[in-house]
Amino acid sequence: MVAPSVLGNQDKAMRQKVMADLATLEQALDMYRLDNLRFPSSEQGLAALVKKPTQEPLPRSWRSDGYVRRLPEDPWGTPYQYRMLGEHGRVDVYSLGADGVPGGEGQDADLGNWAL
């Protein structure tokens, strides 16, 4: 009966990684907003934290070294999703879960910054 315990611990570790990544990305987005008086647009996405956007709205005071070194992937190898004017807050940053599609339950459930 070791398998259920190990799988439960793995699920917990994956969820903890998502939450840690989301907290880091949310903090970087807040710093971007402080510097530029707005969040990146949905089109600019999280990439605006790594590389200065070249499309409107252009950032006013983008940090030369960016806001994060690189964008993390969720534990299932999928990029985190970003939506300005989110459904849950000013911005939504989230993982689509193990299945990589919106919605789902258990390991397939979306995990977002609204759960922080």
Predicted features along the sequence, with ranges:
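N-terminal single-pass transmembrane signal-anchor helix
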Residues: 1-6
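Short, surface-exposed interaction loops/tails
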Residues: 8-16, 27-30, 36, 47, ...
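Non-catalytic regulatory appendages
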Residues: 17, 21-26, 30-36, 43, ...
